């Protein structure tokens, strides 16, 4: 049903959401493991979210608050916290209402996302994505490094931006 390209935070969450809605999901990551950029967030501790209402948070948004407002309404900070706690990652709130895993390990957040995706029968494939296959006006699939091509009814491109090239980010799909 759904092919997701990129196994960072957005790709993993998209895989989980699609699988929870009954779709079969294949998640492809060009690197050898998922969440490499996520591992360095919050100085390796992963600032998961902020523990405040949308109304408290919005005055701190400097650019494009309308876009962010709709995103936060779709999955607010308290729902994010509940999700990770249901996945077995206890959280704590620190100065500035920043939320971190109690362990102070971003790897625990990545592992929780991977475990949840696998629990929902998502197929995760690492180190193989090569290029997007673009048909008429849409992405139809991806070619793999071994020459194989995967197609899907729905394709989500979650390849991230160009920041932190040391993590493997090249801006593919940006």
Positions of PLM-derived features:
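N-terminal Rossmann-like FAD-binding beta1-loop-alpha1 element of flavoenzymes
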Residues: 1-27
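Conserved N-terminal/central alpha/beta ligand/cofactor-binding core
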Residues: 30-123, 128
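Predominantly flavin-linked oxidoreductase catalytic cores and closely associated redox partners
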Residues: 40, 107-174
């Amino acid at each position: 049903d759904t092919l997701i390209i990129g196994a960072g935070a957005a790709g993993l969450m998209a895989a989980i959401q699609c699988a929870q809605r009954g779709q079969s999901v294949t998640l492809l990551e060009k690197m050898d493991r998922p969440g490499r950029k996520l591992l360095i967030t919050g100085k390796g501790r992963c600032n998961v979210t902020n523990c405040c209402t949308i109304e408290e948070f919005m005055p701190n948004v400097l650019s494009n608050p309308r876009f962010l407002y709709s995103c936060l309404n779709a999955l607010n900070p308290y729902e994010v916290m509940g999700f990770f706690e249901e996945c077995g990652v206890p959280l704590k709130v620190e100065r500035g209402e920043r939320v971190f895993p109690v362990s102070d390990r971003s790897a625990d957040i990545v592992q929780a996302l991977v475990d949840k995706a696998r629990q929902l029968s998502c197929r995760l494939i690492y180190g193989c994505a090569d290029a997007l296959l673009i048909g008429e006006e849409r992405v139809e699939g991806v070619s793999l490094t071994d020459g194989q091509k995967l197609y899907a009814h729905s394709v989500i491109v979650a390849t991230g931006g160009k920041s932190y090239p040391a993590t493997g980010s090249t801006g593919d799909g940006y």
